[in-house]
Design a protein with these regions (language model features):
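Anion-binding alpha/beta catalytic cores of soluble intermediary-metabolism enzymes, centered on
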Residues: 1-297
């Protein structure tokens, strides 16, 4: 696994540009990152949105659009569907969310994923870099599924492990987060964790190591955890847990987060609306590396 986002960015610069559909780039940070991503050789952008509006934003931001292709589409859902169709057809390697509600993009991704494979489901992978931890780790799924059942968790885990395999993490360590009750009995989440561990032992997910522990306290050694023992993937039981965990890492531990949402090999970058130019540049680099590794584009 990559040790930090600088390493991922360096890898992106080696790979060369990929065609990316930028969904509703009518925001200063989005259009600036798009232009710089093109300059750095990360992407060849296709801007999808209301042409008059995004052109005005680019002009106000001092960003020349030059030869960037623009597809004029005012309806947000139609625009999101169009972007995913481009990836399905091979006309783009990935989609980048701009100034639009994530819901539209998730709907389009779920639709496209089901068209390609009825037994897969999209999920969000949040890649985290934290000071003092010499590797990037993933939390899933804090974005798409509100409270996934066991079958859905299998699909989420399959997705996450496939992505990490493609990034060179040949035997990812997984922790399925759950809690024990005070009386010693197990919750539904703990039962799911045990079932997933058994499936992992049986080879259901390919090469991986699903930890029997269901929280970090169980693997502490004198108050600390070695990088080797720290999971590469944390599978959360529901969307609330995922959001709390991701935001806590961001704001309490001073972490850096980059999110991608993946389903049936379709890749969308889902930065937060509050993310600035530098974070979005890192997100483009991650998208390029994941697309090159997972899709072989």
């Amino acid at each position: 696994m990559h040790k930090d986002f600088d390493e991922i960015t360096a890898r992106a610069k080696e790979l060369g540009p990929k065609r990316a559909a930028i969904l509703f780039p009518d925001d200063a940070h989005v259009i600036q990152a798009t232009a710089e991503g093109m300059k750095e050789g990360f992407i060849t952008p296709v801007l999808v949105g209301e042409k008059e509006h995004l052109t005005a934003v680019a002009r106000k931001s001092g960003v020349p659009l030059g030869t960037m292709e623009i597809i004029d589409q005012k309806d947000p859902q139609e625009a999101a569907n169009l972007c995913l169709d481009m990836v399905v057809k091979g006309d783009a390697s990935f989609v980048v969310k701009g100034n639009i509600l994530t819901t539209y993009l998730y709907r389009a991704l779920i639709r496209a994923t089901r068209q390609l494979s009825t037994d897969q489901t999209p999920c969000t992978l949040c890649f985290h870099q934290v000071p003092g931890i010499n590797k990037v780790f993933v939390i899933t799924d804090p974005g798409v599924h509100i409270c996934p059942d066991l079958n859905c968790k299998q699909k989420i885990l399959t997705n996450a492990i496939q992505v990490l395999h493609s990034l060179g993490c040949v035997n990812p360590r997984v922790m399925v987060l759950a809690t024990r009750r005070f009386d010693g009995s197990s919750s539904t989440f703990a039962h799911d964790a045990e079932k997933l561990r058994r499936l992992g032992d049986e080879g259901k997910f390919g090469r991986c190591k699903i930890d029997p522990a269901t929280n970090l306290f169980e693997i502490l050694d004198r108050g600390s955890i070695s990088v080797e023992r720290l999971p590469d993937i944390f599978l959360v039981p529901n969307i609330e847990t995922g959001n709390i965990l991701c935001k806590s890492i961001d704001h309490i531990l001073g972490g850096i987060r980059q999110c991608v949402t993946v389903g049936a090999g379709l890749i969308t970058l889902t930065p937060s609306r509050s993310d600035g130019y530098e974070v979005r540049m890192g997100n483009l680099a991650l998208g390029l590396v994941v697309a090159s590794s997972l899709r072989g584009d």
